[in-house]
């Protein structure tokens, strides 16, 4: 069966650990595997890190820079070199590619989100493999994805992918870092119920040249599986394993997807937008929005956290602060603070002007899986 597959490869797999130079044999093996998948009829998107690492190597820098402006400059140097290597290798196999550089802004603005989706769809229809990276050179700190694990999960949600492969420097998820804890236990399959209870010492440390660690991969897997995408963590040095996994072999760690039938708009609310505040809700409101498909009314709001404007996204939390849903609000934070706990027919009297009966309409609300 033809499937849509997103593959993310990190800096630790793309580069040699000591020098930061490109690991050309690994990249060549990856290119060969992805071309094989295309020839089998699958739709392929590659999310590739490495621009900053390659830039550092090209400029003979011994460590990754800390300052944002310097990282952006070095990314500009490295991205050109990286995409050229990919193009040369794919070209030898007759496989066309495209470079797609994204910032978080493209996913926050609804029109840009739709345009990005349409562009990916057109590229895939043409048989092209898009190679995606964050546009580090122009991204601002507040609107950065933070790591390409998150970016790959958001792209997988955007294009309704069937699979997301997170290629890393270990063969699967373990109960602790196997490089530090010799008796760490391997984890091969995680269903949605187990994922909610999963407790592993994942750490937050990436490689010298990259930004990701196992913690970011677990966060990405939560996003992707929540959007209905089966997710796999496996070794980036063995790209041929992708074919074996698709054929049913138990390699790496697989995270089973949740069953979701959300509209494209609700996926955008859940994964594209950045929440700018929180609303704490009572149990009745939680039940209404999560289990009865209703809108959020002011009466069910206990507390407002953060400053935000109308039409921005917020997290909808239970009384303990656990996020249960996300939604686009009809009022700003000051207005909601005034009307919280009151019935809808009291809103105009409290504010002195008329407004929506709902704080978040159900069409602008996405419940967590």
Curated annotation (Swiss-Prot):
Reaction catalysed?
Answer: L-glutamate + ATP = L-glutamyl 5-phosphate + ADP
Keywords (A to Z) from UniProt? Amino-acid biosynthesis, ATP-binding, Cytoplasm, Kinase, Nucleotide-binding, Proline biosynthesis, Transferase
PROSITE patterns recorded for this chain?
GLUTAMATE_5_KINASE (PS00902), PUA (PS50890)
**Localization:** Cytoplasm
Q: Which SMART domains match?
A: PUA
Give the residues the record marks as binding substrate: 49, 136, 148
Is Nucleus one of the keywords? Answer: no
Query: Record's InterPro entries?
Result: AceGlu_kinase-like_sf, Asp/Glu/Uridylate_kinase, G5K_ProB, Glu/AcGlu_kinase, Glu_5kinase, Glu_5kinase/COase_Synthase, Glutamate_5-kinase_CS, PUA
Pfam families noted in UniProt: AA_kinase, PUA
Domain PUA positions:
276-354
GO MF, one term, reads: ATP binding
Just give the chief location class: cytoplasm
**At which positions is ATP bound?**
8, 168-169, 211-217
Task: Describe the family membership recorded for this protein in Swiss-Prot or TrEMBL.
Answer: Belongs to the glutamate 5-kinase family.
- Function description: Catalyzes the transfer of a phosphate group to glutamate to form L-glutamate 5-phosphate.
From the Swiss-Prot or TrEMBL record, give the protein name.
Answer: Glutamate 5-kinase
- Give the organism, scientific name: Rippkaea orientalis (strain PCC 8801 / RF-1) (Cyanothece sp. (strain PCC 8801))
Its gene is proB
